[in-house]
Amino acid sequence: LGEVLVAMKSSRIESGFAKINQGSESWIDPDRVRLIFHQAELGWDIIEEPLEPHEFREKLFSLHVEREGNDGLVVPIDQRFNVQGIGVVGIGYVQSGSIEKHDQIEIVPGGNIGVVRSLQVMDDDVEKADSGDRVGVALRGVDENSLGKGSLIIHHGSDLLTEVTSSTYKLNTTKFQKRILSINDVVHASINLQFKVGRITEIDGELITIDWETPLVVRKDGSGLVIVVQLDAIPMRIFGTISEVSPV
């Protein structure tokens, strides 16, 4: 639980609900749970009593925040499969912007270009999917091997994203991480369902330079959090986030 909460804090998920399910064989101390969340600096509401589904639904809706501005389309894909008679279908959520039938899109990384054949939201055919929607995107004209977990769909011609192979970052280390990174350490970066392997080549104070085995796709404007972990770091694998991307 502790590492999960550190991941939430690092991802800046400051608001949420934690529901305590009391089992018949063991009892969970709500005050202890509140202490753990307090130590993680997460101001989530702790729910002790059972809620009706509609009550919990209303609580979740209360967390909804409208995004400002007209962000470009980004759809991180977590599943891909083929449907006979339709073709390649990607499943993901609309992180920003909107996507419509017949839009010309591009798959990043790779730059494969295709056209949206159809869209489904909640198993219903739709003409358009907006930010926050969980969407199935059927594509025409793309190689099935160009789409997979960690792929991102954007509008063709968009300059929203960039691929970096070696970059210098500011490392924002979580206060729970006692281990210190060193040159030649192998780290992993997680963003938008990508999980990339990199090696640290230079350290200068809070700044670190990382060479990635395969390109890391990030937003050009620097928004979007990149979580850095080290899989053999025990007991805490999460180091924090990197920001201020500067390609080498």
What are these regions (language model features)?
Residues 2, 27, 53-57, 113, ...:
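Amphipathic alpha-helical transducer elements in NTP-driven molecular machines
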